Regions:
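Hydrophobic alpha-helical segments within soluble ligand-binding/sensing domains
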Residues: 179-209, 227, 250-258, 278, ...
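Flexible loop/turn connectors
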Residues: 14-15, 254-364
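N-terminal helix-turn-helix DNA-binding module of bacterial transcription factors
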Residues: 1-78
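Alpha-helical recognition/docking segments in bacterial nutrient-uptake
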Residues: 4, 14-18, 72-194, 262
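Short, solvent-exposed amphipathic alpha-helices that sit
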Residues: 94-109, 191, 217-236, 280, ...
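Short acidic capping loops at alpha-helix termini that bridge into adjacent secondary structure
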Residues: 27-29, 206, 236-240, 292-297
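An alpha-beta-alpha
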Residues: 193-234, 341-359
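Short beta-strand elements in bilobed, periplasmic/extracellular small-molecule ligand-binding domains
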Residues: 108-118, 209, 228-250
Length: 364
């Protein structure tokens, strides 16, 4: 087994496939012999032969009697497929069904079919899907990046898309290394500023924040929270900020609420990264005997179905279907060669505050 836990032949196959897709091994380039590859990678000829067999079966390489093995031009027929790939962190819940619906309606009306992929916010899955989509052939890509605040180690795959003039649109996040690429984003800092200001204007002064550390939305929403505190001359206290990651998002928020109760340092307001986190926080508050909003006011983000149930959650609008439509229209512009200065698609979506019972008494 390789160090990453994969069979050695499979690890070699993946490495060579990445080299082909990134252009490190070019179409028509002759590959080293089995013996040479065996020496280079420190593997048996049998292992090398097995890896080459998979690459040949997938169309990445081709052998000619008496001449050797060559890199195939797997991207030669990549355009004109009629397929647009849509890669999001999740598909079946929260805001994603309506977002995807918006994309599909616009693309279907223009004769395209969509290929859906769900990364689960995994970088490894994102890279694997990109390799697969590039090799199968797509006309364009709409993608929500996974863990967009973490260094992207598969930039070469996006460079391959650029090389073969396959347009792609980022939605809801953007890798630091690719800030200039086409995108549709929410004004996340502005939205978080609005909910924090709402709590401050309602008389709350001891306000905690729960934010996601591994994506752009979390970082931007934290910025909005800080800005509102500064404008109201309230000192920023890092001890009142809870940072969580994709892996601990289902456990850490509730755990930190319990810790606040035990330490007797309870806030009178909590700004949450999104509506899902707000629900977790509110459920734990109630288990700890706290009343909402009398003891603690809570806000969310995204105006999802979660925010419209029960007493309701004060939140920020998310256009969902409209965002999908905007991304699809921008991609169609790119496919048609419309210059950026002539684009009719808005790139930044302005936030709107929706006040509900989680932050103010409604009288119901």
């Amino acid at each position: 087994m390789a160090e990453n836990g994969k069979a050695k032949y499979y690890a070699l196959m993946e490495e060579m496939k990445t080299d082909i897709l990134s252009g490190k091994i070019r179409p028509g380039e002759k590959l080293p012999s089995e013996n040479q590859l065996s020496v280079r990678y420190g593997l048996s000829r049998h292992t090398v032969r097995k890896a080459l067999g998979i690459l040949a079966g997938d169309g990445y390489i081709e052998s000619f009697q008496g001449k050797g093995t060559f890199c195939a031009d797997v991207l030669r027929q990549i355009h004109g497929t009629g397929n647009i790939a849509v890669v999001t962190t999740y598909i079946s819940d929260y805001i994603f069904p309506r977002l995807i619906q918006g994309i599909d309606e616009v693309l279907s009306d223009n004769g395209y079919s969509i290929i859906l992929k769900n990364t689960g916010n995994s970088r490894q899955k994102e890279a694997r899907f990109l390799e697969e989509l590039i090799s199968k052939g797509i006309d364009g890509l709409i993608i929500e990046p996974s863990k967009s605040e973490v260094l992207c180690r598969h930039v070469s795959l996006y460079e391959t898309l650029d090389k073969y003039q396959i347009p792609y649109i980022f939605i809801q996040g953007l890798y630091t290394e690719m800030q200039e690429k086409p995108h549709i984003l929410m004004d996340d800092a502005g939205g978080s500023y609005l909910v924090t200001k709402h709590l401050l204007d309602s008389g709350r002064r001891n306000i905690a924040g729960f934010f996601k550390a591994d994506d752009r939305q979390g970082i931007e929403r934290h910025k909005g929270y800080v800005k509102a505190l500064q404008e109201h001359e309230i000192a920023y206290d890092p001890d009142k900020v809870v940072w969580f990651h994709t892996e601990d998002r289902r456990k850490k928020p509730a755990l930190m609420v319990r810790n606040m109760v035990r330490q007797n340092s309870f806030p009178d307001g909590i700004v949450c990264y999104n509506d899902q986190i707000a629900v977790q926080v509110m459920e734990e508050l109630e288990r700890q005997g706290k009343k909402i909003p009398e003891d603690v006011a809570v806000t969310g983000y995204d105006n999802s179905l979660y925010a419209r149930q029960g007493q309701g959650i004060t939140t920020i609008t998310h256009p969902q279907e409209k965002l999908g439509e905007m991304a699809a229209k921008l991609l169609l512009e790119k496919l048609s060669g419309v210059p950026d200065e002539e684009s009719k698609v808005e790139r930044l979506i302005r936030p709107e505050l929706i006040v509900r019972g989680s932050s103010v008494k409604t009288g119901i």
